[in-house]
């Protein structure tokens, strides 16, 4: 039926044309895993097929397997999940969805747990910015970029694909989804995605207090969420393209509290809604020139509610609304075969309306201008850019609450990176980079209740790195081996932190951090027999992140939630009968506070998962059945202190491609 609708849409526009017909071949393509060994900056990628074979449950699970990343996970299926790269902080990491950045000016960090993995075609993490010279100025301004690209199959004219999936698992998890792709014309594709997920999240854990222990169940960890999006992708005859996306997300969840002294009773609730409409137009406007124009409108709404006798009416309620109007234009110029240049200009207007008493309802206008150049001559590639940031704010209720308007902020942020191929006939590269970035204070940093401080300066970060990459040639059954190793040094100054004053906490610029580390990755593919192959990937990070604040009582201590050693491993065995995926992630010991004492120490852990899947051909349709066991050893651990993570869980899924 889906194909018939798609054919009708195509035929209606061309019903006067009579042509002969030859047999056509349907080609479905998925963006394959990239080694990225030739990039001047570290880039790690996971294809959608890798993600599905491993049975990963969410974006955070995938990101944990990338070197240099630190995911804060507050536990449970609905717990908030944020990512920091090389310990610069979640506010320095940009998240893009099909090429355009996702924003949250109020809090400054993105909950990556809200994004579905089911329609991901490629997930990549870049240190610095992405590799596309035509990207937005926001990408160039970020210290790291997590890019989510949705799946786009290649179809014949008038053809369509329908994917129905049902997933269920432990703790009441139920997750149906539907995806539809339609090649409505020779140059136009439409797609629809919808999914629903719910879970009660009442997973068991062992509560320990000294020598005593008891078996408990997690409370207030339920979630119910809906997600839908529609895309229209069109290619023009002049080589241009126009991609338009409408996206909607709604969730209601419990906010699981910390488990302290046998008390994990939490009655906090959170409702989230997010809608955005984005469009991107790209084309070559002359032989040497190309243009990319992007625009986006975002509306975010969230409601926080806490029921507790300590409040005057027994309940506390906060409602926040954010609106963003965003536009971006990038003009690229390639005067010679070895030189490319680009000029990117972004303008964003962000507005916050909140019921929190004392908020001045701020409006921020930000301009980002990036001048970019990339030269490739012989075996050397050099990339450089400089970003100019200008931000100004106005306050609707400044006089009412006697809040001073922050000063306008201006900043130049340069970046330089290069790579050099050491041998002309061997894929062996060395690379180095330096990058300066900064983050503006969030609306919460500036205005939230009494802790906000409108005198805050931007937080500055400087990145330095050097490394080596190698990709082998095929050797017998060994398709390839890809290795990367990068050493880095980062320093962060004017850190924005909450600092105790005489009566209350206050946001201030106080502190300096120095981060030293080494990231290493490995990937290989081996054909072990006809129809049998192994794909293996691993990552390892060693990191020292020290407090270097002069006069601080914790000077020289490892920063909170920063393990010195962390890593991940995944192995896929592909056979004609069943595909087996194994993955493991782990972290060494770390501390929940700046005081590196046993009282605040979190023990290291390793989590192992196993997935079995098989594809069945049913006529012209494909059915995939998959069974995944997460945390096979039922290891109990915490990523955030007093927030226990789930133990062993089982997920079963069926996916039908029509």
Predicted feature residues:
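Extracytoplasmic beta-strand/coil segments of soluble accessory domains associated
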Residues: 60, 64-101
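A beta-strand signature from Gram-negative outer-membrane beta-barrel systems
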Residues: 117-163
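Flexible loop and strand-edge segments within Gram-negative outer membrane beta-barrel domains
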Residues: 201-205, 215-225, 233-291, 297-324, ...
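Transmembrane beta-barrel wall of Gram-negative outer-membrane proteins
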Residues: 168-198, 209-252, 273-290, 336-339, ...
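Short, acidic, small-residue-rich periplasmic hinge/interaction motif at the N-terminus
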Residues: 12-52, 60, 125
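Gram-negative outer-membrane beta-barrel transporters
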Residues: 482-491, 509-592, 633
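Structural signature of Gram-negative outer-membrane beta-barrels, strongest in the C-terminal barrel
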Residues: 336-346, 350, 354-490, 570
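Membrane-embedded beta-barrel scaffold of Gram-negative outer-membrane proteins
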Residues: 288-306, 429-433, 459-516, 521-523, ...
